UniProtKB/Swiss-Prot annotation:
Single Gene Ontology BP annotation: retinol metabolic process
Record keywords, A-Z: Lipid metabolism, NADP, Oxidoreductase
Protein name (Swiss-Prot/TrEMBL): Retinol dehydrogenase 14
A Pfam family annotated for this UniProt entry: adh_short
Origin species: Mus musculus (Mouse)
Signal peptide: none
Binding-site positions, NADP(+): 51-57
Active site per database record: 215
A Gene Ontology term for the protein's cellular component: endoplasmic reticulum
Top-rank lineage group of the source organism: Eukaryota
Transmembrane segments: none
List of residues binding substrate: 190
Amino acid sequence: MAVASVAAALLAALGGALWLAARRFSGPRNQRQQGGGDPGLMHGKTVLITGANSGLGRATAAELLRLGARVIMGCRDRARAEEAAGQLRQELCQAGGAGPDGTDGQLVVKELDLASLRSVRAFCQELLQEEPRLDVLINNAGVFHCPYTKTEDGFEMQFGVNHLGHFLLTNLLLGLLKSSAPSRIVVVSSKLYKYGEINFEDLNSEQSYNKSFCYSRSKLANILFTRELARRLEGTNVTVNVLHPGIVRTNLGRHIHIPLLARPLFNLVSWAFFKTPLEGAQTSIYLACSPDVEGVSGRYFGDCKEEELLPKAMDESVARKLWDISEVMVGILK
């Protein structure tokens, strides 16, 4: 009897997932929401996207390329990035956009390892020498739920890549962003920031390590960084906003262990419930190019709309302290 009940429950769950999947498949799919626009909207604009070879970053790059932007893909694995760039050029050509030679929207691949401050500095030095302007910086790359490892500089990996690497990158490019104004900075965070806390006594997780907590902490740091940066950029005509993309089907969760027998059901449920990368990228695209947010800075967005933050994400004293400590950690000298 117990076995029959379990089997019935599993069949019911599977049937429900199939029904939802069918609804998702047959219902209207608004792939391009408010973040979309006409080809040419970003013509003449240079956009840097970190982690642009897969997932949200790739979808963001594809759409901004379609809109006519010159897109710089800052990626850790150059070979994979070159492969993705080739696919994006071909897709754009097939869709009737720019030709394979990139005469309208352009793609440039550059190596950038956010787990290495040396790599970040080398990347910025090269970019500052080669690029006369930078209109949009999208801090998209990230790691999630990885086992305890450290960056090249000895930082806990999730905090080091998700926060510190982008902190240094942004600071080194601020001069170019200011000279290119009006310009925008877009920071990709997560709703999971709600479960994070900034423990200044153990930012490197030497005392204890929890994958989920450390990811949430890094995403909370993204928001605090955005709000403090917005305060510092007042009057410069450079804006910075932060977003959550929702739950998206990407390879970001590759470190999450799912039992073998549960994988088919998980894959089906994720297909039914999770956003596609293009759907998840809409808020990044919206903040990068929409006239609706011109002059808007220091705000938190989801689904192309402003959302409220928990008080801990708006704590100005914590944001300032995190900024000061981050400057020391990455070696920025005043």
